[in-house]
Curated annotation (Swiss-Prot):
Pfam families: FHA. InterPro entries: Cell_Proc_Reg/RNA_Proc, FHA_dom, OxygluDhInhib_OdhI, SMAD_FHA_dom_sf. An essential component of the PknG signaling pathway. When unphosphorylated, it inhibits the activity of 2-oxoglutarate dehydrogenase. When phosphorylated it does not inhibit 2-oxoglutarate dehydrogenase. Keywords: Cytoplasm, Phosphoprotein. Disulfide bonds: none annotated. PANTHER family: NUCLEAR INHIBITOR OF PROTEIN PHOSPHATASE-1 (PTHR23308). Transmembrane segments: none annotated. PROSITE patterns: FHA_DOMAIN. This is Oxoglutarate dehydrogenase inhibitor. Gene3D superfamilies: 2.60.200.20. The gene is odhI. The lineage of its organism: Bacteria, Bacillati, Actinomycetota, Actinomycetes, Mycobacteriales. Residues 68-117 form the FHA domain. One of its GO terms (cellular component) is cytoplasm.
Amino acid sequence: MSDNTGVPEASVETTSVFRADLLKEMESGSQHDASPAGVEGLPEGSALLVVKRGPNAGSRFLLDQETTAAGRHPDSDIFLDDVTVSRRHAEFRRNGDQYEVVDVGSLNGTYVNREPKNSSVLSNGDEIQIGKFRLVFLNGSKEA
């Protein structure tokens, strides 16, 4: 017997496979200034990271906390399982309606739009590289 009541249990996992056509749009660079379909449904004040290249391409991570940790440690909010990623690699910090990525002492560094950065305020469409992973930042809020 199971205790299944027919109502799915709420999961804290925020990853899922994203549309393949979105990855192609991001590759072509056509979505840098426009929000792709689905982003308008994000909760207010949140943003989305989509894995563009690397293991688990297409996975997405919701940024909906003040600080979201990314790294190879299994307890990381964003678990990036590859030896090129430090256990505590970077943090995504929400400051008002902006997000900032901050390298927290990683061995291989954190890159924003292919430039090494200790910290950087993110704009819609920015590409963040953490080890072998390339993630695209998508902000659901309206930018001026």
